[in-house]
Each structure stands twice: as C-alpha cells, then as structure tokens.
UniProtKB/Swiss-Prot annotation:
Its EC number is 3.1.1.32, 3.1.1.4. This is Phospholipase ABHD3. It catalyses: a 1,2-diacyl-sn-glycero-3-phosphocholine + H2O = a 1-acyl-sn-glycero-3-phosphocholine + a fatty acid + H(+); a 1,2-diacyl-sn-glycero-3-phosphocholine + H2O = a 2-acyl-sn-glycero-3-phosphocholine + a fatty acid + H(+); 1-tetradecanoyl-2-(9Z,12Z-octadecadienoyl)-sn-glycero-3-phosphocholine + H2O = 2-(9Z,12Z-octadecadienoyl)-sn-glycero-3-phosphocholine + tetradecanoate + H(+); 1-tetradecanoyl-2-(9Z,12Z-octadecadienoyl)-sn-glycero-3-phosphocholine + H2O = 1-tetradecanoyl-sn-glycero-3-phosphocholine + (9Z,12Z)-octadecadienoate + H(+). GO terms for cellular component: membrane. It comes from Mus musculus (Mouse). It is found in: Membrane. It is an enzyme of class 3 (hydrolase). It comes from the Eukaryota.
Length: 411
C-alpha cells in the first residue's frame, strides 16, 4: 500500500512537471504551432494588403475639381486601410455606433417656424471660442444633416462637429421634424424627396450669417435630401459646397438590397421599428389621413414607406415616391462642388446603382468610392475609437473649400 502511494506521488509529480512545462512552452513555444501562427499571419497580411487595403476610385466630372482635390484634399487619393480585424461591410456598419467615441458637444437649440405652421429643431454649436474666426459674422458655418432617424446626438455628427471645432468653424444640425423630442405641430414628418424644410433651413441660416462661408454635409438619408435639394435648385443656393456620405443613390436598389434575408434581419427590421417608434408618439396627428394600425404592422422600410411616407406626401404609388426620392436622377443638375463618399460594399447602397456615368458628365461632382467601409462605417486603425476615414475626408474637404475654394472659379 505504501509502495502504491509512493508510485502515485511520483506519477503525480511527473505529471505536474510535464503540465508545467507545457504551460511554459505552450502552443507558441511549439515549433509547429509557431510556424502555423507565423504562416497564417504572413498569408493574412499579404491578402489584406493585396485585396483589402486599396486607394479609392475617383470619378470626377471636371479636370479642375480633380486637381483641386489632389492638391487640397489628398486623403481621397490615399490608400484606405480598413480595420484589419473588421473590414467586412456588415461588420463595419454594425460596429461603428458601438465602438466610436462620442465627443461631448454643448448645443444651443433653436426652433424655427415653417410655412405650414410646423416647426424645425436646429441644434447649434456656435464655437464662440474659435481662435481662427473670432468674428462670428464671418465664421464658416457647416450645416449637418443626419441619417434616417438620426439626430444631433449621433456619433458621426459629434465627430464632424469636433473636427469643425478644431478648424474654428460653427455647426448647425438640422433635425427632421418630430425626431429630436420637439412637438409635432402639424400632421407632417419628413422624407428625402421633399426639400421644403431644408430650403427653409438653408435660407434661415444664411440670413443670420450672410457674410460667412456656408457649406453642408449630409449622411445617408441626410445626404439624399441634400443632393435632391441641390439637384432642384442648381447653383441658386447660398451653399458654396457640400459633401455627402453613404448616400443611397437609387431607392429601388437600396430597398431590394435591404430586403435580402440577412440584411433584413440585421438592418431593415430594426430601422422599421425605429421609424414606427418615431411616428407612434405623434399618432394622434395622423389618424385622419393614414391607417396607423397598418403602419405599425409594417415589417420593412418598403412597407412603412408604402403605408405612411408615400401617403403623407401625396404620392399616387410607392414607385412614384421612390422615383422622386432617388438622387441619381438629379445629380446632373447639381451646380456647386459636391464630394460624395460611398463604399462599394455598402448593403444600403449597392455599387451597381452608383451613378458613375452621370457623375462623369457634371464638372461639379466628385465620387470617392472605397472598396470597403460599409454604411457610415469607414473604420480604420487597430482600435477604431476615434477618427474614421469618413471623418478625415470631411475635415480635409470642408477646410479645402473654405480656404481654397476660390481657386475652383479661377481654374
């Protein structure tokens, strides 16, 4: 019995020494394991550098605008390196709202009245401590338009404001009716085809600071609205330039892409519930003209638009609304310099619907098309908490237009 106990102790000690050795050496200490790790790392790095990290495709209608961007907005000619562990479209799209920081911004709210008796909520960042533009009357103003159900609290809006603050600029965020907590005074919300509210906001802001450089930037649906406005008004706008990000160019193609099973599960259904939530709190305003019970049963953005948006804005059919809402139709009429950043892997805006040929025919338009980036993603760096590629494009472009925009008229 004593012998057996001694043998067990010896066996236990030997086993413990063996396990300790394995822990110390581990997988990485194994020649085979280390070779596998190194081999995989080299193969992945080669794949990433050859197939993922690429320079954007530039589609610019005019030689003057092309030279201007190369000289003053070089980021659009540089290789975009998506986050190495998250470069796929859906991953970038889903991760950005959760991983990017939210710089603190103190707003001043203003409610302006509309011709139909409604009101629009504007959130101002006045930047009164600007060291570069002490005189408020000439301080550059950037009008920011958030996405579908977005407000001034979105992280991408906060980052644009933070970058504008560094440049000394003032910002104002255009919150669509009823989404920012303000009361809805009339039975009307918003859509990207109807530009009346945006026209009122542009006129109002310009009337306050007529001597200040005035630019606009729109994200997703905000960019669609901005492009539709510019396409309708041409060069007769107080805006000197504009930028759009992750715009859906063809509403039919966007809807079809978002209705594919995985995209519907990840994005479409959630956004539909957000739209329903935004109108539910104002339900009493719509009951006379819209069947709200059917609206609340919608399972997709298309169904919501058919039962609510198209009806509210007087379209005969959903197809009529989607045709009018698609900014690709009006791109040829844009009359001021506009930079449009899209990722060709964006499931919200499929690449085949990007109006490349139309852009080539308008000297005021520049399309910047990255291979990756998703929808309002454009994450870069190992831990993409701070600035994205989209942010860098925004900052360089607005600075270029404010400081060197006069060169375009001389080219």
């Amino acid at each position: 019995m004593q012998r057996l106990a001694m043998d067990l102790r010896v066996l236990s000690r030997e086993l413990a020494l063996y396990l300790e050795h394995q822990v110390r050496v581990g997988f990485f200490g194994s020649g085979v394991g280390l070779s596998l790790i190194l081999g995989f790392s080299v193969a992945y790095a080669c794949y990433y550098l050859s197939s993922i990290a690429k320079k954007p495709q530039l589609v610019i209608g005019g030689e003057s605008f092309s030279r201007f961007l190369q000289d003053h907005c070089p980021v659009v000619t540089e290789t975009y390196y998506p986050t190495v562990w998250c470069w796929e479209s859906r991953g970038q799209t889903l991760l950005r709202p959760f991983i990017t920081s939210k710089p603190p911004v103190q707003y001043r709210n203003e409610l302006i009245k509309t011709a139909d008796g409604g009101q629009i909520s504007l959130d101002w960042f006045d930047n009164n401590n600007s060291a570069y533009y002490v005189d408020a009357s000439t301080r550059p103003t950037i009008l920011l338009l958030p996405g579908l159900t977005g407000t001034s609290k979105e992280s991408y809006i906060l980052h644009m404001i933070h970058l504008s603050e560094e440049l000394g600029y003032r910002c104002v965020v255009f919150n669509n009716r009823g989404v920012a907590g303000e009361s809805l005074l009339t039975p009307r919300t918003y859509c990207c085809a109807n530009t009346e509210d945006l026209e009122a906001v542009v006129h109002h802001v310009h009337s306050l600071y007529p001597g200040a450089p005035f630019l606009a930037a729109g994200v997703s649906m905000g960019g669609m609205l901005l492009l539709n406005y510019l396409g309708k008004i041409g060069s007769k706008t107080p805006l000197m330039a504009a930028a759009t990000f992750s715009v859906g160019w063809n509403t039919f193609a966007c809807s079809e892409s978002l209705e594919r099973p995985l995209n519907w599960l990840l994005f479409n259904y959630y956004l539909t519930t957000c739209l329903q939530s935004s109108v539910k709190k104002h339900r009493h305003m719509f009951v006379e003209q819209i069947d709200m019970d059917q609206v609340m049963k919608a399972k997709s953005i298309r169904e919501f638009d058919k039962r609510f948006t198209a009806v509210m804005f007087g379209y005969r059919t959903l197809d009529d609304y989607y045709t009018d809402a698609s900014p690709n139709r009006r791109l040829k009429s844009v009359g001021i310099p506009v930079l449009c950043l899209n990722a060709t892997d964006d499931v919200f805006s499929p690449s085949h619907a990007i109006p490349i040929e139309t852009a080539k025919q308008n000297p005021n338009v520049a399309l910047v098309l990255t291979a990756y980036g998703g929808h309002i993603g454009f994450l870069e760096g190992i831990w993409p908490r701070q600035c994205t590629y989209m942010d860098r494009v925004f900052k360089q472009f607005v600075q270029a237009m404010v400081e060197h925009g006069h060169e375009l008229s001389n080219m």
